[in-house]
Swiss-Prot record:
EC assignment: 6.3.2.2
Protein name per Swiss-Prot or TrEMBL: Glutamate--cysteine ligase catalytic subunit
An annotated Gene Ontology molecular function: magnesium ion binding
GO terms for cellular component: cytosol; glutamate-cysteine ligase complex; mitochondrion
Activity control: Feedback inhibition by glutathione.
Family per similarity comment: Belongs to the glutamate--cysteine ligase type 3 family.
Gene: GCLC
Function: Catalyzes the ATP-dependent ligation of L-glutamate and L-cysteine and participates in the first and rate-limiting step in glutathione biosynthesis.
InterPro entries, per database record: GCS, Gln_synth/guanido_kin_cat_dom
UniProt lineage: Eukaryota, Metazoa, Chordata, Craniata, Vertebrata
């Protein structure tokens, strides 16, 4: 989760005093990198995935499942057995926000050959097996986007009660500080977001109104004025960073051949973010309730919203410099490529001094405004030992701001003094239950980048429409019921990367005629006379490629999953979870998820993930039935 510096963290007041210093030197560090590597070309399109996991413990006797606060210990063992022993170990493990979470990636990035698509699932299985092998009896490693009873009494093992005091990190009524990773970055981020904002974060998620759900649904917080003011009727109220950053996701990073190719990919994939997010929807439950949303994006956005009342437009500007329209965790605000420029229709708040400085240093308008927009934010964590740096050889101040702008896409300059290329990160996906599904989504997105570059595809629409799509994508059953703005003619371009833009730029078409509302089924599978469909385009690309039979078979299985999720033939994880709870014998149609219902659900998820049972409505028949890891968690029931 971004920059992990070691040392003594500063309080918000101390960090604030150094904010201008961090910004000033962050820009100098960016300029050093830019001038050193702006002409760097890479032959190979490298890429890699990141999967976040939760550690859970099953109490089969009492029918409870809890999150195990042993992430640091598990991580230490995994690193000791893996990368520290063998630098070429096939897996890498990193800490995540929750002390019940870990993050796993392949040990080395994947390369540009088609056959590497066939190794993704095997590597994910290796990760799952590796981490599972060191867990205790009745514990499991789960890829679940949001734990349904996160923040409910007794959701952790060992059980810890929240202690909502000012001196703590989150001051939460529900989420104890002990559930935050012990690395000082995480608790400092939590505390400093709250202190900068001037109050606790506020998350209100609409509750799903079932037959017996109280109407209006109102929770009372008599002990806490802040919660009483912040909570809304008919909403599930949450008050801590952990409710967002304590969820799991699936991300992919690509290394492009050049900076211009990275900018082109960044823009094209930005339009795809809401579509893939809706397709990967996996988080319908929050704080023990059934919600009316299927994706975590808005929850995580609110959970790290450090904007003051002035910046949110609730009070006149006095102590702050800007009105800021979005949280630090949200969708992108500007396209970076020349062909994206005419679709930049969102008002962009920028630091004008930084923007002018970047222009004077030879940075073009689009990249300058992107960086100047990121740098309207304050640093949230700072370590005493890391204030004065060598700007020519270090990038911590740049990364400090860059890595706490959590957007749908991230444009990543190479680290200083490395041979890494310019990269982009695709960040909107929800993690799926199985390695098969996670591989399918990763391979789909990576293949899409290959096709975008090979066929010079153009998905660009006005950025405000992408934002509207992001809102639709989070709604319940968006994959089947949502309509999304999408470009009609995506095959217009000339040599998009070299020319900096496709021919569409020169056309006299009105932007409004270039796009229309489509269903996800139409976007993914196509509709005669309306849109060719992304999967048919990927299939035609595959037909023209040299691909061995085994790899082709794997890829087709992955694409079949995406195709059927888009058409509704298969359920999203979110839809499947809703049906599971709705059909549970204990469910009273009141939107409440009890301990026992949660236990049944997570146990089933774990059985599916370890291929101990089939789930055709979620996975279809393409799911390969290969037994690959002994489970420590199966109950005798």
């Amino acid at each position: 989760m971004g920059l992990l510096s070691q040392g003594s963290p500063l309080s918000w007041e101390e960090t604030k005093r150094h904010a201008d210093h961090v910004r000033r030197h962050g820009i100098l560090q960016f300029l050093h990198i830019y001038h050193a590597v702006k002409d760097r070309h890479k032959d190979v399109l490298k890429w890699g995935d990141e999967v976040e996991y939760m550690l859970v413990s099953f109490d089969h006797e009492n029918k409870k499942v809890r999150l195990v606060l042993s992430g640091e210990k598990v991580l230490e063992t995994l690193q000791e057995k893996g990368e520290r022993t063998n630098p070429n170990h096939p897996t890498l493990w990193r800490p995540e926000y929750g002390s019940y979470m870990i993050e796993g990636t392949p040990g080395q990035p994947y390369g540009g050959t088609m056959s590497e698509f066939n190794t993704v699932e095997a590597n994910m299985r290796k990760r799952r097996k590796e981490a599972t092998s060191i867990l205790e009896e009745n514990q499991a490693l789960c890829t679940i986007t949001s734990f349904p009873r996160l923040g409910c009494p007794g959701f952790t093992l060992p059980e810890v009660k929240p202690n909502p005091v000012e001196g703590g990190a989150s001051k939460s009524l529900f989420f104890p500080d002990e559930a935050i990773n012990k690395h000082p970055r995480f608790s400092t981020l939590t505390r400093n977001i709250r202190h900068r904002r001037g109050e606790k974060v506020v998350i209100n998620v609409p509750i799903f109104k079932d037959k017996n759900t109280p109407s209006p649904f109102i929770e009372t917080f008599t002990e806490d004025d802040e919660a009483s003011r912040a909570s809304k009727p008919d909403h599930i109220y949450m008050d801590a960073m952990g409710f967002g950053m304590g969820n799991c996701c699936l991300q992919v990073t690509f290394q492009a051949c050049s900076i211009s190719e990275a900018r082109y990919l960044y823009d094209q994939l930005a339009t795809i973010c809401p579509i893939v997010m809706a397709l990967s929807a996996a988080s319908p439950f929050y704080r023990g309730y059934v919600s009316d949303i299927d994706c975590r994006w808005g929850v995580i956005s609110a959970s790290v919203d450090d904007r003051t009342r002035e910046e949110r437009g609730l009070e006149p500007l006095k102590n702050n410099n800007y009105r800021i329209s979005k949280s630090r965790y949200d969708s992108i605000d500007s396209y970076l490529s020349k062909c994206g420029e005419k679709y930049n229709d969102i008002d962009l708040t920028i630091d004008k001094e930084i923007y002018e400085q970047l222009l004077q240093e030879g940075i073009d308008h689009l990249l300058a405004q992107h960086v100047a927009h990121l740098f309207i934010r304050d640093p949230l964590t700072l370590f005493e030992e890391k204030i004065h740096l060598d700007d020519a050889n270090e990038s911590d101040h740049f990364e400090n701001i860059q890595s706490t702008n959590w957007q749908t896409m991230r444009f990543k300059p190479p680290p200083p003094n490395s041979d890494i290329g310019w990269r982009v990160e695709f960040r909107p996906m929800e993690v799926q239950l199985t390695d098969f599904e996670n591989s399918a989504y990763v391979v789909f997105v990576v293949l899409l980048t290959r096709v975008i570059l090979s066929y010079k595809l153009d998905f660009l629409i006005p950025l405000s429409k992408v934002d509207e799509n992001m809102k639709v994508a989070q709604k319940r059953d968006a994959v089947l019921q949502g309509m999304f703005y999408f470009r009609k003619d995506i095959c217009k371009g000339g040599n998009a990367v070299v020319d900096g833009c496709g021919k569409a730029q020169n056309s006299t078409e009105l932007a409004a005629e270039e796009y229309t509302l489509m269903s996800i089924d139409t976007i993914i599978n196509g509709k005669e006379g309306v849109f060719p469909g992304l999967i048919p385009i990927l299939n035609s690309y595959l037909e023209n490629m040299e691909v061995d039979v085994d790899t082709r078979c794997s890829i087709l299985n992955y694409l079949k999953l995406i195709k059927k999720r888009a058409s509704g033939e298969l359920m999203t994880v979110a839809r499947w979870m809703r049906e599971f709870i709705a059909n549970h014998p204990d469910y009273k149609q009141d939107s409440v998820i009890t301990d026992e219902m949660n236990y049944s659900l997570i146990l089933k998820c774990n059985q599916i993930a370890n291929e101990l049972c089939e789930c055709p409505e979620l996975l279809g028949s393409a799911f390969r039935k290969v037994k690959y890891s002994g489970s420590k968690t199966d109950s005798s029931n």
